[in-house]
Amino acid sequence: MDNKLNIVIITGMSGAGKTVAIQSFEDMGYFTVDNIPPNLIEKFVGLLNTPDNKIDKVALVVDMRSRAFFEDIQSIVTELTDNTSVNFKLLFLDANDTELVSRYKETRRSHPLAIDGRTLDGITKEREILADLKNLSEVVIDTSELTPRNLRARILQKFATSTESTFRIEVMSFGFKYGLPLDADLVFDVRFLPNPHYISELRDKNGTDQEVYDYVMEHPQSEEFYQNLMKMLVPILPAYKKEGKSVLTIAFGCTGGQHRSVAFAERVSAALREKWHLNVSHRDKDRRKETVNRS
């Protein structure tokens, strides 16, 4: 098994998409650093490349914002390439002059090397400075015709391993009386189901307890809802992934977030976990118990 530290340096033309790139690596679980001065890279890698280090993937953005130190970058790239204790790749993002000028006009920002505000002059100068670095790059992506979503997909295609999940599903339960979860993408209200709260022997239990789970699921409307829900979810989840979404949060709500919503979150997460990278959580499952204990 290869336990080497994986390092990707992201560089290229200003305006070519380095922000999208570093966000894509973050979604793949990389530890990311934006605009690191090149002369600090060797020391930074040394701190991480130790036996007790728990960070195994690092993506660093180096560009002309660090121009005072940029002359060091080629020697550092050479050193990392020759370093047998790390896996190193250099990613260069490029775009044609017309597209770069258009992007700068759209954002109304100045090019870091622009002379007297002339964007094209800055682009020309930057292209000359980066020419040798581009030739050293293992991966070059021209973003001229790529949308941010397309660029993200291209990066995932080239850098994501078969064992990495770039799309994660968060299944959660909550109680409406405590408010909607702000980060939920899909919210399902299960308050139409019979409430175990009114069964004395179930009141103090929750949807992770087998007795409560069985009570919730034994009703015909529960099974009908579950079957219809899965018919909807199964085809749309791949579409969310294809659109470039990194996390999809599916929330189930009942009155207090203790019984019905918990049971359904458990059942749905168990079904989806066979195919998807998934986490399940219960925001309000123990809130009533905590309130009673404080009183």
From Swiss-Prot:
InterPro entries: P-loop_NTPase (IPR027417), RapZ-like (IPR005337), RapZ-like_N (IPR053930), RapZ_C (IPR053931). Pfam families: PapZ_C, RapZ-like_N. Keywords: ATP-binding, GTP-binding, Nucleotide-binding. GTP binds at D63, M64, R65, S66. ATP binds at G12, M13, S14, G15, A16, G17, K18, T19. GO terms for molecular function: ATP binding; GTP binding. It comes from the Bacteria. PANTHER family: RNASE ADAPTER PROTEIN RAPZ. HAMAP family: RapZ_like. Displays ATPase and GTPase activities. Belongs to the RapZ-like family. This is Nucleotide-binding protein llmg_1557. It comes from Lactococcus lactis subsp. cremoris (strain MG1363).
